[in-house]
Amino acid sequence: MMKMNRYALVAALAIFLSGCVGQREPAPVDEVKPAPEQPAEPQQPVPVVPSVPTIPQQPGPIEHEDQTAQPAPRVRHYDWNSAMQPMVGKMLQADGVTAGNVLLVDSVNNRTNGSLNAGEATETLRNALANNGKFTLVSAQQLAMAKQQLGLSPQDSLGTRSKAIGIARNVGAQYVLYSSAAGNVNAPSLQMQLMLVQTGEIIWSGKGAVQQQ
């Protein structure tokens, strides 16, 4: 009898438990909601850098030859010797010329209307008087030193007769030969004057034409 009651109790307990299981509400299931879509940020417009136009290369300044350039001066050559030799011969035979004295030959002074090589003329004159038999010439070195004392270069003419006489006295000369080329530079005339240093007197003068070579 007791064993049957035990079975009945077990059966009743099983029924009770099954009822409880049937009445249990299911656990709430959280509904997975999709995440709200974020609105897409508007894209910032990419700034467009305007292209810099290519600047055409400017041509350099056009160089023109200087039209105002002066032409090189013409180099003239003269036959000084043909003009000087006859004049020197006459001077050595002039009255008042005493042999054995010292002669200062000044540089030929250019008084023409153009440019000429006065140094060449002076050298030719000194050569024409070399070994003349009457005068001893003041050396070119002595004359250059005397000119430097006046602030002149050896090639410079003394310019005036008074300066020439003053230099002649300083170097111990008794005579001075003053020469100049004058007139048209294309056909100059050569003038010579032989002066006595002591008095400044012109004891001989001559003039001759000079031809170009």
Swiss-Prot record:
Pfam families: LpoB. A lipid is attached at residue 20 (N-palmitoyl cysteine). Keywords: Cell outer membrane, Cell shape, Lipoprotein, Membrane, Palmitate, Peptidoglycan synthesis, Signal. It comes from the Bacteria. It is found in: Cell outer membrane. InterPro entries: LpoB. GO terms for biological process: peptidoglycan biosynthetic process; regulation of cell shape. GO terms for cellular component: periplasmic side of cell outer membrane. A lipid is attached at residue 20 (S-diacylglycerol cysteine). The keyword Lipoprotein applies. It is a lipid-anchor. Residues 1-19 form the signal peptide. Residues 36-50 have a biased composition (Pro residues). Belongs to the LpoB family. Interacts with PBP1b. Regulator of peptidoglycan synthesis that is essential for the function of penicillin-binding protein 1B (PBP1b). NCBIfam families: lp. This is Penicillin-binding protein activator LpoB. It comes from Citrobacter koseri (strain ATCC BAA-895 / CDC 4225-83 / SGSC4696).
